[in-house]
Amino acid sequence: MSILSQFDPAVAEAIQHETERQEYNLELIASENFVSEAVLEAQGSVMTNKYAEGYPGKRYYGGCHHVDVVENLAIERAKELFGAEHANVQPHAGSQANMAVYNAVCQPGDTILGMNLSHGGHLTHGSPVNFSGRFYNVVPYGVSPDTETIDYNEVERLALEHKPKMIVVGASAYPRIIDFPAFRAIADKVGAKVMVDMAHIAGLVAAGVHPNPVPYAEFVTTTTHKTLRGPRGGMILCREEYAKTINSQIFPGIQGGPLMHVIAAKAVAFKEALQPEFKTYQQQIVKNAAKLAECLMAKGFKLTSGGTDNHLMLINFTGTEITGKAAEEALDKAGITVNKNTVPFETRSPFVTSGIRVGTPACTSHGLKETEMEQVAGFIADAVANIGNDEALAAIQKRVNELMKKFPLYASRLK
């Protein structure tokens, strides 16, 4: 019996049940992934005990020589991974990374261009319920009604009209390749800075299966989980000329002590991402997404933009009685985890939605490949066809569990 299970069996039991859920359910939330045992070990280490305000070699606390080693490793590996001049690995999350860049470039009331949340953007790209929408004058851009892909001509028109201080590029639910040179050219016409939030595609970028935004943007932010398959956290990449400003905007600007156990885990994840097998893994994520999209469309599902170029897709129920909320709940009962999601030109409430977001990073970490994607599409179709039929959904769950048992993830952690 573990120390935790002896002292706090309630927490230990919840952790065990979550381990079983991750092991036996089909995880299709596009922003989720499973870290390696090495990353778990680093994050669960004694590094969690150390305060280390400041930066390597310039701390406000003594005893930081060992945490300096891991932070420097994380920084240098991140720079190598993305070809960046400077990396700050201290942001606790992607939102803090984005906030630091806003603070470095903009004053309250300045104009920014950001992707409309319902068209695939992110809360921190100017949503009115977020700090980014409250502090700045936000001009949203979106996708074309015809292609459901980014309308670059409209972005240029808006930029020329509103003269933004910064253009925010990136998305949380956009299934297509983003044209970074096009955004750079638009920004240059109006003298704007470019911030690319590559949180969703960082792993794809690191492996060279999606274009790299670093050469085209003054600032690139990301989370370190999602496709990058590291611990939950954030990071900022920037040109050397902005290094001091960015560092000061993180500490002491918006954060105090960094989470050194998480930074240690980031360093490990970045080393993993530098290995040849990581490229193979990212290529498989994209292959799986393409196959799943193909199979879903063959079963009659409408996908926003007609498919995917990356790791995710949006199943669009517009024009049907099915809602994203109902589909999410039915799939959950079938052992398949997705999230309801707004779709472009959404007509329903964000608490109900007309779509679900589906992604392949986590199931690819389990080892599923194209053959299994055909089965996955069948599970999804069967579950959506049986909304409200709990008996049928329970039967699908058994089939899902049987499939996932063939692809163990954390076998040593199961009882």
From Swiss-Prot:
One of its GO terms (biological process) is tetrahydrofolate interconversion. It catalyses: (6R)-5,10-methylene-5,6,7,8-tetrahydrofolate + glycine + H2O = (6S)-5,6,7,8-tetrahydrofolate + L-serine. It is found in: Cytoplasm. Its EC number is 2.1.2.1. (6S)-5,6,7,8-tetrahydrofolate binds at L117, G121, H122, L123, E241, S349, P350, F351. One of its GO terms (cellular component) is cytosol. The keyword Transport does not apply. Keywords: Amino-acid biosynthesis, Cytoplasm, One-carbon metabolism, Pyridoxal phosphate, Transferase. PROSITE patterns: SHMT. The record marks H225 as: Plays an important role in substrate specificity. The modification N6-(pyridoxal phosphate)lysine is found at K226. Gene3D superfamilies: Aspartate Aminotransferase, domain 1 (3.90.1150.10), Type I PLP-dependent aspartate aminotransferase-like (Major domain) (3.40.640.10). The keyword Amino-acid biosynthesis applies. Its cofactor is pyridoxal 5'-phosphate. Pathway: One-carbon metabolism; tetrahydrofolate interconversion; Amino-acid biosynthesis; glycine biosynthesis; glycine from L-serine: step 1/1. Its main location: cytoplasm. GO terms for molecular function: glycine hydroxymethyltransferase activity; pyridoxal phosphate binding. InterPro entries: PyrdxlP-dep_Trfase, PyrdxlP-dep_Trfase_major, PyrdxlP-dep_Trfase_small, Ser_HO-MeTrfase, Ser_HO-MeTrfase-like, Ser_HO-MeTrfase_PLP_BS, SHMT-like_dom. Homodimer. Belongs to the SHMT family. Catalyzes the reversible interconversion of serine and glycine with tetrahydrofolate (THF) serving as the one-carbon carrier. This reaction serves as the major source of one-carbon groups required for the biosynthesis of purines, thymidylate, methionine, and other important biomolecules. Also exhibits THF-independent aldolase activity toward beta-hydroxyamino acids, producing glycine and aldehydes, via a retro-aldol mechanism. This is Serine hydroxymethyltransferase.
